[in-house]
UniProtKB/Swiss-Prot annotation:
It is a multi-pass membrane protein. The chain crosses the membrane at residues 1-21, 74-94, 107-127, 147-167, 179-199, 238-258, 262-282, 293-313. The gene is nuoH1. PROSITE patterns: COMPLEX1_ND1_2. GO terms for cellular component: plasma membrane. It comes from Rhodopseudomonas palustris (strain BisB5). InterPro entries: NADH_UbQ_OxRdtase_su1/FPO, NADH_UbQ_OxRdtase_su1_CS. GO terms for biological process: aerobic respiration. This is NADH-quinone oxidoreductase subunit H 1. It catalyses: a quinone + NADH + 5 H(+)(in) = a quinol + NAD(+) + 4 H(+)(out). It holds the Pfam family NADHdh. NDH-1 is composed of 14 different subunits. Subunits NuoA, H, J, K, L, M, N constitute the membrane sector of the complex. NDH-1 shuttles electrons from NADH, via FMN and iron-sulfur (Fe-S) centers, to quinones in the respiratory chain. The immediate electron acceptor for the enzyme in this species is believed to be ubiquinone. Couples the redox reaction to proton translocation (for every two electrons transferred, four hydrogen ions are translocated across the cytoplasmic membrane), and thus conserves the redox energy in a proton gradient. This subunit may bind ubiquinone.
Amino acid sequence: MIGLIITATISVTLIMVLLVVAGTFTWVERRLLGFVQERLGPNRVGPFGSLQWIADTVKILTKEDRPPPGADKFAYILAPAVAATPVLAGFGVIEFGDGLSLAAVDVGVLFLIGMLGLTAYAVVLGAWASHSRFALMGGMRAAAQMLAYEVFLGLSLMGAVMLAGSLSMNAIVEAQRDVWFVVLQPLGAALFCIAGVAAAHRLPFDLPESENDLVAGFMTEYTGMSFGLFFLGEYLAVLLVSALAVTLFFGGWLGPWLPGPIWFGLKTGVIAVVFVWLRATLPRPRYDQLLSFAWKIALPLSLANLLLTGIVVVARSAS
């Protein structure tokens, strides 16, 4: 009973920390976008606008949340929760330090891929439930994008898994004590980051919510906290993909002088800032170009990287 209470307390604490980090990340993103676009960004609430995300949260909580006419109310309400919950669950197996995780799962990588994949179902569910043509088109785009990018997302990280010989997050990090896997797997790391951007539905792969032609895509009919949960799920997905990239390719918590969790946080922050930089600088491609890149370029490269890694691993074990 005491162990259950301790686990529940740690879980709630982790969720609260993640919510604060996600909110702070929205402020960092807006400030960086303002810098790139030569404007100020948030600068009114708190020092340098650092409390703007709290004001936005209060605003969202006080807005009316009403399903549109003709919507499937149960699915409409369920979809935002499905968008945020799997991502929060994914952080439960992330190794923030040596043995510092909520749940030490031997197949942590597989679990995380499954959790990231569930976010696409939330998009499709919300799009279908909204009873809107714009939302439905966004949901169809999300389904096609998920089929394309989830495939090579899994294939791109298999190189690191093969080098470590395990699906355990801890074992993968420990295998990088001599050299980070980004050195041994540069192509795999690049492909994983590209697929991660698509999995999080971030620019330039945010076609399911493209404002130019779909108003707000699958979120067109959402308001209030329902919209906020979709928004939260997206930013948490960015942080989760960044944390997974750090674990797989950038040595996890390993580093000199500083404690492991600090190294992990710094590395994750750098990857997340790269996501923001991509949003600020890259244009949104056409949808056919998005899918063509996935099936015709990224997937063959992922298979080639996997084959080459397999040959190297077999040759190393034979020698």
